[in-house]
């Protein structure tokens, strides 16, 4: 189901939004505007939020999360007739996200008062599986990961990883799917020393990056104002 309101028992921490909050009344400079495909905002007028095509193709058809995005034929099993009609009217392209629904399920509205998820219990299962594997029990970590996915996402999933690093990579794959659009991938890329390869992933030519792991472009620079106002920071700290 679409994560449009804070009514799921899996939410542990969130930003609770009210219709009268300035982030809503000031216009469309808010999370639903940038992420929502079926409400009015930046995303629905062309700044579509789309999944990496290669990652999408790695999601099994038996995984319910595959419906969080439109497929190559602009279809999702997770959408009802009203949602399909709105996606068609807006012209949502293939691989557009359907994970985040509009506020109260009302199509095309500009009252973007959806609550914003910050932490869900699903992430805790993934953290546990990785911790078990990297703590010396890869078989336990693999079992934890498989049970979570089997119970809640894909009954056909089998974790074949046997080494600690292989289980860690399997967890990372699940994190990329489960936590898509929740602001965690950048930190995983740094933490796990991964690169960003967008070749063949459906991105516009100007954004087809192939950044190797550990590249300096992955590190945010210290703002110039901080460098100027803090005598303990020098230009060399940014190089």
Please provide the spans of the model-predicted regions.
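Residue-level signal for threonine
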Residues: 51-53, 223
